[in-house]
Amino acid sequence: TSPSANVIAWPGATDGHHSVYNKQNPLLADLSVNQKITGRNSSKDVRHIEISLAGSGLSYQPGDALGVYFLNDSALVRDLLLLTAISRDTPVQLAGETFTIEQALTEQLELTQSYPAFVEKYAAATHNAALTELVADKAALRAYLSERQIIDIVRDHPGLLSAQQLVDALRKQQPRLYSIASSQAEVEDEVHLTVAVVRYDAYGQPHLGGASGFLAERLNEGDKVKVFVEQNNNFRLPANDDT
């Protein structure tokens, strides 16, 4: 999918500052402000997001990022289960734990970014000759995956597979990193983000980015969101103001 311009990944980035909260143990924080800052007639949807870090001990510096864990859209999960004729209560195994397929698709697995490994595994599970042929042509596969989410592939090539086969074909969801748009010296126990919502129409269907759609469309002010600070040691302002 088309990535948000302010979702970032830094080489050499490390976990945040002195706090019990990190990528493996994120803070369940309050989303305090979700404000659209683009005009009514703008083709872009950009949000000013404020999240409370009160009592967490989390701190950040210029150049750091906020990692955001998100839930996939329940409507997207429902449609995927309908297309694959899988009951939402079907138990599946994921990383040694048991979930219902609905839980796994909502909380654990990547649905809004497509990738070659999914096509390969889905083609094998559904015995789809056309997809198997596509997998062999890397350039054609890259072109096919452009702007397609997982559900687009399944919609294009419907087939029967088990709930466990679907889970095994999907990769683990990764938190999205957003550049922090605030100075902690000014906002203290808050963190501010400027989030460009990934939203586009393709193949006859509306599409939303996973994390940006979650923050903009599915979280209300006062709702909880799991976050952590990702420190960027490659970007630091000089300690001396005269530098």
Where are the model-predicted features located?
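FNR-like FAD-binding dehydrogenase module
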Residues: 1-243
